[in-house]
Amino acid sequence: MAPPRKRTRDLMPKFLNTESFDEFNQRLNNLPAESNVTSDEDAQFLESRKCQSKRWRKEEPLKLNLRSPWNVLCSPESISSAKFIVEKTCLIPVPSFEEAATNARRCLNTSSIPGSSGSASETNSGSDITKQDFKNDSPSDSKKVQGSSTSKSAKPKVIKVYSFVDLVTTTKKGNIQTEESSLNHEKKLGTVVDIVEPMKCDERSKEVQGSSTSKSAKPKVIKVYSFADVVTTTKKGNIQTEESSLNHEKKLGTVVDIIEPMKCDERSKEVQGSSTSKSAKLKVIKVYSFADVVTTTKKGNIQTEESSLNHEKKLGTVVDIVEPMKCDERSKEVQGSSTSKSEKPKVIKVYSFADVVTTTKKGNIQTEESSLNHEKKLGTVVDIVEPMKCDEGTKCEVTTTNKGKIHTEERSLNHEKKLGTVVDIVEPMKCDEGSKCEVTTTNKGNTQTEERSLNHEKKLGIGVDIVEPMKCDEGTKCEVTTTNKGKIQTEERSLNYEKKLGIGVDIVEPMKCDEENKCEVNADTFDVVIVEPMKCNKVTKCEVNVDTTGVNIVEPMKCNEVTKCEVNVDTIGVDIVEPMKCNEESKCEVNADTMSLQKRSKRAVSLVERFTEEEIKLHIMSLKKPSTQSAVEGMCDLKEEEESCQLCDDGTLLFPPQPLYCLLCSRRIDDRSFYYTPGEEELSNAQHQICSPCHSRCKTKFPLCGVFIDKHKMLKRSNFDNADTEEWVQCESCEKWQHQICGLYNKLKDEDKTAEYICPTCLLEECQSINNMALVDYTDSGAKDLPETVLSYFLEQRLFKRLKEERYQTAKATGKSINDVPEPEGLTLRVVFSADRTLTVNKQFASLLHKENFPSEFPYRSKVILLFQKVHGVDICIFALFVQEFGSECSQPNQRSTYIFYLDSVKYFKPERVTFAGEALRTFVYHEVLIGYLEYCKLRGFTTSYIWACPPKIGQDYIMYSHPKTQQTPDTKKLRKWYVSMLQKAAEQRVVMNVTNLYDRFFDSTEEYMTAARLPYFEGSFWSNRAEIMIQDIEREGNNELQKKVKLLSRRKVKTMSYKTTGDVDVDDVKNILLMEKLEKEVFPNKKDLMVVELNYSCTRCSKAVLSGLRWFCEKCKNLHLCESCYDAGQELPGEHIYKRMDKEKHQLSKVQVNGVLFSTTEDNDIIQENDMFESRQAFLAFSQKHNYNFHTLRHAKHSSMMILHHLHTSNKHHCSQNSSSLTCTACKKDVSTTIYFPCLLCPDYRACTGCYTKNRTLRHLHIFPTLPSANRAPSRTVMVLEILNAISHALLCQHKTTKSCSYPKCHEVKALFTHNVQCKIRKKGTRCNTCYKLWQTIRIHVYHCQDLNCPVPQCRDRKEVLIRKV
């Protein structure tokens, strides 16, 4: 058997020899093999010795924890019968022998061995076998030691402690936070503590108690590097209180030796006791800083600071100040006597007595009192080594009283009473506030007076020796009287230095303002302009208190790295050109209840700056959602060393690659697929690509764009390599990086890279400090700031009305309260493009129809309508509509028709609920926008609207670039159903008269002369594109072939499609007939998708609109409508027509009177808006793809919409600057030359903008405005009220006794109103009659505009006198 290890043997008792231990170890720790077990007793014994854990495959001998006393182990026999104890828990590092017992795998039943005294938590005796369980304690936790150690490697009763961190109990209730520090190290440690290395960055209280007996440390000496932050902080609302209690006497009880200066010790640090260490002098403590034993109390805007440094009780020893106390921002006072050998006895070198000032502020009145009872606190001679530069400790006593607009300051320096010693001023007093002159300031109205008096003889008691000239020395400042009356300012200076100083004054240089001085500004007036900033000295502390408005600081107040700047701004209108940059080492306490102090032009680069606190929180939460992160396909792997975005927690992100289409199959190449490009020089620079499936099917050589391409020479590329990377931006406040899209950063506003960007997180903190107000007020950044048009006003008001009705119906259908039904918020509808364009007809198509006078071009107006919804503070574009309007000035067949060109949407509409009819609210809103547009066109006199239900292919975009992945692309059937549902609603609202399709309207008609010239011609329409291709095919055929094909046609087709009735046709007629025949075959399968919507009836034969007069129609034939002229010229018998197809069956005709529409012509006097971005659908899509304005995620949709609005506002500013005029709103004087307004129909020069018209209800009662606003000085439409007003004046003078005999319009109706008013029984009962109320409303309008003093209208003169008295 091998002997035990050496390290184990060294730890054994000396009287136990090696042979005995070997025999003992053999009996206890060696087990027989399983194959050698012969008896049941041996098997049971072997089973009990096996390890319980399955992971421990290797069995090793368990070394016992032998305890003292060892005198019982006197022989091997006693060992064999000994009873041993195994520890289960140990809190301290143990000797090597005990470590072996800790890691043991097996244990053996032995006789009892007496255990040594200790702190074992659990013991087992006899046959109880226990495996030791040790807890792993972190270095930051407390370490306890008990007992004695005889190990040579460790000193007895000494613990090396590196940090006592965070033994603090923190309680937070609401906005109130309390911290309590309780370091009862006596109870926890109980031993000597040796601090080996300085506790750097130990932010909590660290305290040590006990005595040290370790050899590495001196006896009863503790090396302390920092006693920081034993402070109890209580915060209640806006009131914060700090109390510092350093009872080091009770906690330490030993001598404290401060080895190095306590740098950056921001809280109170105090030392007590005596030092017996060899490195420090007897009973001398080296103190480098006694800082901030200050109790601060803040109530509302009132802040009070009290300084109490009772060093006598806390120190009780001599204080030796080795070096000057730099960066000591609070009151620093020293007491006692010095017995150090390097310094004189009972002399303290003082470099600064700063700011023992009590400040009290009540409302706009601020009072400061300085009390330096140095006699009681110091009691020793004060030696001022260097001049006190802006020494706040010797600052004069200032009493400030502010009553109304009168401001008074009084200063008194009783240095004799406070110091009690002679003051030796070595160098001249440069702005020494301790000897600052007494200033009395009086402000009465706009007059300000300042009086200064330097009674230095009385205050200092010594002669004043001025070595150098006084450069703006506030202590010797001249007496200045300033008077400000209106715009005239007068200053008077009087230098009575003989009286004040007692010596001659030699002024060598002008008094320049010393940057080291401290300026105390208390301004209660307006328009105070400080040309240069108040620069803060490194040693001084700047306290700025601005209680006024209109203070314009040209340059910022720069904060020194060492000083603390306390800024208390309770006003607004403070405009600082550059921000106040605070050093990292300094603490800036900012209390701002007003607008941000940053320059607005330098902060207008992020849209988040206009958000409220709630909007910023919602925006940040939306970026943290996992769906936002996973939606990005092109996200790169985030490396370990790569910095992630602070807002979305993602690294480098990629935009979706630009869409590429295969030249052979015209399909879009997937974003992550491969494609091939030709390597030939002829096609290398062009964008020609082939998808992988087409490349695999191609031959070795194949033609492409007129060039033969070698398949093996083509280059393989990845579409994912074409993706762009999202750009980053760094916050100027926290210096963290975010994606420009996450931070809603607008780089177009920071092209010169001089603007300051603040991230949403920092803006949230700033927003919380200014009472939930937007930091920057953008006046031209939202969708509502876009100019309104007549169409947008009509659609928006109609949409809001319909949403209210839907909400009421949903609440009624579901049985809920109307407040429980969510409504969409933040909807804004604007027309962003409206311009006149011309559609050019294909030359071959125009030459084919030249005999029918088919025009070569069609003028129309193109419009783009966008719907925005504010989501998390951002106006997101959720719906887009492109339309073309062909007005009454256009030729047939496009006259008075509109074409729904394209529409598109993204699925970000809120809320996501269903209506009472069971459809999505999002669908309801989009339907109402379309129905509203059709109604607007109907009122303007349009007769027909054409819709082509053609959905985009999967992966293809119509208007908005890159839709969300969760949004499904509808097929043709779903899209057609969507349009049919919308048209059914329009028919129920009597907006649409009839809905048919293109085939039934033009190809299956019962009337004659249905040729290609009757078909409307639109850009990009289904039938127009097909017709152009068919004409090219017809032109390739010869005339003989055309004649043969005409003979194959039926006689009915030839007669229906030809103008001639003789039966002879020429070549052009043949081409026309063949074209209509081919178009009919193409249109018939898709006729349900080609919808024709009739807004107003038009004549089937002449295609003219039937807007007034009689309209003849057939009840059996849906598409037959005749005007009066066509009916009179017809060959049928009066009152009937012949149905041609069914053997000339005769149908009866009916007639109806048509009421005229509001507009006789479709002339559009709305605002003209032009920009290159929305010139066409393809232009906007290409613009979005170029700048990566996509909508596939919410974060991208926010940023893209923000940038689109920026481009719109920029183009509108340029447009308004060119078209602005003197046309303004009469009420608010707003320029309405480039927007819409409401003109009064009675007052020729009175006009109201949309804001005044909407908000001012009285204005609408006193003036007569049209139903729709006007624009571009267009003449307004008359209304019914104007006709009634004219009829009232006529009816009172009318001589006809009967109403039927008078031909004046509305005369008999007005007379009936007056008769009813006299005989009304409802009004006589005291209740309100609606008919009488409407009459008196009309009379009130008449009174407001009537200029006749003898007006015969009833009550006109009485009401006019009342109106004059009010004015």
From Swiss-Prot:
A zinc finger (ZZ-type) spans 1094-1157, 1220-1273. Residues 188-512 are annotated as: 12 X 13 AA approximate repeats. Zn(2+) 1 binds at C1099, C1102, C1123, C1126. It catalyses: L-lysyl-[protein] + acetyl-CoA = N(6)-acetyl-L-lysyl-[protein] + CoA + H(+). Sequence repeats lie at residues 188-200, 223-235, 251-263, 286-298, 314-326, 349-361, 377-389, 418-430, 432-444, 459-471, 473-485, 500-512. Keywords: Activator, Acyltransferase, Chromatin regulator, Metal-binding, Nucleus, Repeat, Transcription, Transcription regulation, Transferase, Zinc, Zinc-finger. CDD domains: PHD_HAC_like, ZZ_dah. GO terms for cellular component: nucleus. Zn(2+) 2 binds at C1225, C1228, C1249, C1252. Residues 780-1213 form the CBP/p300-type HAT domain. Pfam families: HAT_KAT11 (PF08214), PHD (PF00628), zf-TAZ (PF02135), ZZ (PF00569). A zinc finger (PHD-type) spans 688-765. Gene3D superfamilies: 3.30.60.90, TAZ domain, Zinc/RING finger domain, C3HC4 (zinc finger). Residues 110-151 are annotated as: Disordered. It is found in: Nucleus. Its EC number is 2.3.1.48. Zn(2+) 3 binds at C1240, C1243, H1261, H1263. One of its GO terms (molecular function) is protein-lysine-acetyltransferase activity. Residues 130-144 have a biased composition (Basic and acidic residues). Acetyltransferase enzyme. Acetylates histones, giving a specific tag for transcriptional activation. No acetyltransferase activity found in vitro. This is Histone acetyltransferase HAC2. It comes from Arabidopsis thaliana. The lineage of its organism: Eukaryota, Viridiplantae, Streptophyta, Embryophyta, Tracheophyta.
